[in-house]
Structures are given as C-alpha cells and as structure tokens.
Regions:
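Residue(s) in the substrate-gating loop at a strand-loop-helix junction
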Residues: 139
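Alpha-helical segment proximal to the catalytic Tyr-Lys
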Residues: 125, 168-172, 232
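Short, small/polar-rich loop/turn modules that mediate ligand/substrate recognition or access, typified
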Residues: 86, 171, 176, 234-236
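Active-site helix of classical SDR
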Residues: 120, 155, 163
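Short C-terminal tail/terminal secondary-structure segment
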Residues: 144, 224, 235-254
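Substrate-binding pocket helix/loop in short-chain dehydrogenase/reductase
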Residues: 96-97, 104-109, 204
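Conserved glycine-rich cofactor-binding loop
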Residues: 7, 14-15
Length: 254
C-alpha cells in the first residue's frame, strides 16, 4: 500500500468525487479524515471505508467557515500529523454576469478559493517537515470561459493560479501542490440530471472526444498519484481528467 502511515484530509468527502477520493486513499493505507456538512452522508461513507478495511474519521464542517475549518485542520495535524490535503469541496453557482448578484458571485469564491487558501495556509505549516502533498480539485470550466457560470468558472480559474503560486512558494519546503481539472463526471447529481433529461446526457457525451463521461474513481486515481510518492517530482501541475475535452477546446479556440 503506497500511502501506509499517511494522514489525509478530504473536503467535500461525503459524495461524488470526494467520496471516491476518500475510498481510494484509504484503500492504499492512508488514514483519511473526511469533512462535509451532512453528518449522515459522512457516516455512510465512513461505514463503507471501514467495511473495506480502511481507517477513517469524519468531521462535520462547512469549509466556508474558514475559522473553524482551519482549526479542524490544525487539530488533525496535531493529533495525527498531516501529509495530504485534498481541497475538493465546491460551490457550483449558475448565472451570467448580467444576472448573478455580487453575493452569488462571491459565494463561489468563498468556498472554492477562500477556503482553499485558508486550508493551504494551515496545511503548509503542518506539513513543513513531512514532505506533504496538496491537491486542489478545479474544473474544466477553470480552463475556459463558461457562459452562464460566471462565478464558478472565474473561481475555478483563480484556484488554478493559486495552485501554481503555492507550488512555487512551497517547493523549497518539499511540499507539492497540484491541481486536477475534471470534465463531465458521472456523480450522483449528474446521474439524476441525466435521468430527468436523457437527451441532454447524450449530448454531453457526444461532445467529449472519448464519447462518454468520466467516473469519480477515474478522478480519484489521479489524486492518488499526486498524493503519493509516485509523483515526487511533480508540483504546479494541472492534470485534466476530461476524456480529451480540454484538448478539443484548445483546437476549436486556436
């Protein structure tokens, strides 16, 4: 197991991509601390991880409350040490610049950027002697302008730049900071949407070079690589997990 003896925090760990990441890291020997706002969902994830032989604890946490969020990270670090931080929790806001209120716009940044910044700040101090890894989950919409998602797209673009900046500031500390940018992924929310509108699902898949949506486990596999020593010389990277969609966009826009 490549993460034996490591402790990792996964935000937004109660569902979808975060759930898959938690299960994957635990399956490779990490003690995972999963946090989210829904206690029942967290415990369901924890039960599955324990049933598979993994080590897990849960923390009910709203990452937008940065004071309590950073206190939680510090508490985990003081109790178990901290080797891995996966900033996965996200707010997905809809609305164009003309329509979305400034408050709606800011909510995307509070969760997607402010919480990540605050979490990294504490994690970097905790990891300074641990050769740690921070993985920020961005989005394909951070690589391109996405009409109708002004706040979300802008915040995910900011997250990518923050990742690059943090990687430069921490490289001398032997802490690696990388990003993963998922494309369309078959999360429970996406699955519910497709069930309500099958034609929309077909259209999404048809627009992906690999002709299908990704699975949460496929994102988790990349996070495992970045969290482990397999990527010991990788920092500041942005790895798309999107079935080739980003390359298609680059060709079309070029």
């Amino acid at each position: 197991m490549i993460l034996t003896g490591k402790t990792g925090i996964i935000t937004g760990g109660s569902d979808g991509i975060g759930r898959a990441i938690a299960a994957k890291l635990a399956s490779e020997g990490a003690h995972v601390v999963i946090c989210a706002r829904n206690a029942d969902k967290l415990e369901a994830v924890a039960e599955d991880i324990r049933a598979a032989g993994g080590s897990v604890e849960t923390r009910v946490q709203d990452v937008a409350d940065t004071k309590s969020f950073t206190a939680m990270i510090a508490d985990v670090a003081s109790s178990n040490g901290l080797d891995i931080l996966v900033n996965n929790a996200a707010h997905v806001g809809f609305g164009s610049i003309a329509d979305a209120s400034l408050e709606d716009f800011r909510e995307n940044f509070r969760v997607n950027v402010d919480a990540t910044y605050a979490g990294m700040q504490v994690a970097i101090k905790a990891m300074s002697n641990n050769c740690g890894s921070i993985v920020n989950i961005s989005s394909i919409n951070g690589d391109r302008a996405m009409p109708g998602m002004a706040g979300y797209s802008s915040s995910k673009a900011a997250l990518l730049h923050l990742t690059r900046l943090a990687s430069m500031e921490t490289a001398g500390l032997n802490i690696r900071v990388n990003a993963v940018t998922p494309g369309p992924i078959m999360t429970p929310g996406t699955e519910a949407f497709i069930q309500s509108d099958p034609k929309a699902g077909e259209a999404i898949a048809a627009g992906i070079p690999m002709q299908r949506m990704g699975m949460p486990e496929e994102v988790a596999n990349v996070v495992l690589f970045l969290a482990s020593d397999m990527s010991s010389y990788v920092t500041g990277a942005n790895i798309p997990v999107d079935g080739g969609k980003a390359n298609e966009l680059a060709v079309n826009q070029g």
